[in-house]
């Protein structure tokens, strides 16, 4: 049927060690070109996204909506948890029934009672049991929730993810980011030649455009009866095996495009992330915040305690740093008269990679003049309530084995109260007994304690003993000053600062404080950071003279906060790896495969 490979294509197939399936696809591509058909055309008119079409015609039944349905079992098949019955009424309209009842036979009449819900987009009866009570006809049930599309014309495009030929007809499914829909190509509608062309040259994985009319099959599945189609992009590689999807984690992260094609869960996570950021922007706008942009290439590594990435500007002949945090630039804007500002963007920290850390990550930082950290606590609670209601529709979130409750007010606990509860030791021990603290760190099996500064030791001990039991959203408040060089001294205790971290499911999700706006105090804190750096703390901040100068012009009382968007999405999406919520996470260089001798 297909012509032989040209020498050029054949050489390419050998060079890249293509599979037999890939060679066949390459042959098809060559033949399409020989026929004068462009396998990669310029455009296609799309009238709507698939998800919008499905949403319009497939209303979800109310939760736990019970019905009784009668009909004849056209087919009975076993599932993992029981049986699936195709139940049809006198009009031939079908519904899927999922049940654990034994002894069911095709062509027998049954009445089932169960919960009406959609399974893979199809209106179905689940948790169904046989009953002697009178049931309704299937079509009467479907009339309530499966609206008749009345052969509405549509023009849709997507990736072909399934296909089966039945002689005079072809069924398949196309998928875009918003959903999947069945397509139906019929010889009597498109003609024998076009049906044969689709069967011969279109493969699962290809991107196709279809024009036709919507209708429902007897099972109630929303379907496009295709009148015209067009190949929009030929896929030279087969998709991952249908029933198992793409399971290789390394491949999923390196080839995220393939992950998004094959795994509905990956698409769900990144749509959730997009929705979260969209709603976050709306929330800030509602509260009078202005979105701004600050430099990513910065002359001084400051704004947070972290090791920076270093680069070199050839023209300026100077070292620059990828930003650790936008904090000092955002506070300069407060000095300049911007009352409330926020920025959503990338930060970079040249540190370890693990399930909660990626060197390149996304944060939102925001600052409000005339607020203190008490105002931020209330604002943060309100923001989280808003975001969860808009993205998930609930304040209770399943995360691993826990159910997290975001109903305000969140729990609050003081930093040193938590340490005392866990260790029995008070604030003076942690701030004044350095050798005792070092001994405790050794007992906790914290590595490299001899090389750590006082601040680093305290931070590591807190992480080890205090965060383990912080599952529900909890504000840890009133941090030690030695850990917080940019925060304002606590108004009641000079050893502390007015700072909080929001811990959820053991993760630090937010960090905030009443901002230090005294230029003399700030300079002293920077000098202390320089001492820490000289003692070996590579994450200590550098002096920023221009920021001091900005404070000298006067910064009003201000509170600021940073929220890690990646970790927040991890929690809302119920995943335990930050790589699952970053489209293209940082990975080790891919090992090149050895060429065959």
Curated annotation (Swiss-Prot):
Mg(2+) 2 binds at residue 508. Mg(2+) 1 binds at residues 501, 508. It comes from Aquifex aeolicus (strain VF5). Gene3D superfamilies: Bira Bifunctional Protein, Domain 2 (3.30.930.10), Nucleic acid-binding proteins (2.40.50.140). Homodimer. This is Lysine--tRNA ligase. The keyword Ligase applies. The gene is lysS. GO terms for cellular component: cytoplasm; cytosol. The keyword Mitochondrion does not apply. The lineage of its organism: Bacteria, Pseudomonadati, Aquificota, Aquificia, Aquificales. Keywords: Aminoacyl-tRNA synthetase, ATP-binding, Cytoplasm, Ligase, Magnesium, Metal-binding, Nucleotide-binding, Protein biosynthesis. GO terms for biological process: lysyl-tRNA aminoacylation. It is found in: Cytoplasm. Binds 3 Mg(2+) ions per subunit.
């Amino acid at each position: 049927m297909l012509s032989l490979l040209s020498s050029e294509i054949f050489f390419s197939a050998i060079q890249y060690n293509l599979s037999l399936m890939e060679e066949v696809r390459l042959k098809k591509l060559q033949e399409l070109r020989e026929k004068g058909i462009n396998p990669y055309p310029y455009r296609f008119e799309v009238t709507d996204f698939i998800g919008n079409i499905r949403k319009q015609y497939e209303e979800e039944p109310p939760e736990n909506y019970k019905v009784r349905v009668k009909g004849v079992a056209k087919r009975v098949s076993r599932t993992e948890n029981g049986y699936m019955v195709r139940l049809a009424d006198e009009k031939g309209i079908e519904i899927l029934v999922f049940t654990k009842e034994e002894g069911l036979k095709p062509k027998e009449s049954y009445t089932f009672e169960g919960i009406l819900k959609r399974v893979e987009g199809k209106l179905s009866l689940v948790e169904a049991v046989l009953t002697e009570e009178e049931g309704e006809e299937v079509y009467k049930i479907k009339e309530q929730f499966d609206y008749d599309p009345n052969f509405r014309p549509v023009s849709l495009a997507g990736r072909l993810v399934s296909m089966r030929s039945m002689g005079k007809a072809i069924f398949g499914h196309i998928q875009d980011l918003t959903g999947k829909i069945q397509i139906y190509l019929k010889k009597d509608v498109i003609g024998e030649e076009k049906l044969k062309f689709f069967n011969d040259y279109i493969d699962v994985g290809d991107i196709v455009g279809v024009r036709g009319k919507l209708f429902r099959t007897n099972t109630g599945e929303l379907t496009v009866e295709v009148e015209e189609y067009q190949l929009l992009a030929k896929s030279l590689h087969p998709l991952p095996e249908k029933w198992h999807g793409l399971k290789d984690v390394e491949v999923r992260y390196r080839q995220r495009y393939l992950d998004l094609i094959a795994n509905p869960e990956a698409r769900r996570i990144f749509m959730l992330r997009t929705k979260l950021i969209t709603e976050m922007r709306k929330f800030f706008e509602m509260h009078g915040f202005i979105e701004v942009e600050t430099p990513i290439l910065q002359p001084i590594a400051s704004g947070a305690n972290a090791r920076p990435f270093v680069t070199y500007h050839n023209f300026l002949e100077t070292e620059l740093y990828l930003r650790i945090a936008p904090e000092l630039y955002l506070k300069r804007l407060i000095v300049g008269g911007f009352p409330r500002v926020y920025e959503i963007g990338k930060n970079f920290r040249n540190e370890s990679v693990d399930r909660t850390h990626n060197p390149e990550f996304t944060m939102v930082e925001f600052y409000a003049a005339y607020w203190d950290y008490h105002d931020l606590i209330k604002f943060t609670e309100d923001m989280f309530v808003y975001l969860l209601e808009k993205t998930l529709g609930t304040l209770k979130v399943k995360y691993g084995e826990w159910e997290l409750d975001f109903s305000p007010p969140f729990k609050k606990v003081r930093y040193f109260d938590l340490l005392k509860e866990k260790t029995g030791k008070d604030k003076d021990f942690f701030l004044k007994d350095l050798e005792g603290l070092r001994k405790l760190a050794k007992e906790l099996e914290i590595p490299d304690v001899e090389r750590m500064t006082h601040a680093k030791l305290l931070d590591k001990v807190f992480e080890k003993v205090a965060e383990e039991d912080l599952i529900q959203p909890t504000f840890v408040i009133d941090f030690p000053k030695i850990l917080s060089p940019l925060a304002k001294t606590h108004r009641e205790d000079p050893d502390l600062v007015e700072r909080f971290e929001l811990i959820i499911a053991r993760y630090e999700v937010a960090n905030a404080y009443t901002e230090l706006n005294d230029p003399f105090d700030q300079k002293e804190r920077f000098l202390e950071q320089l001492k820490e750096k000289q003692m070996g703390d590579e994450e200590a901040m550098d002096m920023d003279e221009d920021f001091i100068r900005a404070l000298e012009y006067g910064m009003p009382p201000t509170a600021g906060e940073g929220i890690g968007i990646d970790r927040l999405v991890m929690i809302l999406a119920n995943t335990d790896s930050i790589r699952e919520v970053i489209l293209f996470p940082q990975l080790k260089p891919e090992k090149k495969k050895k060429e065959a001798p």
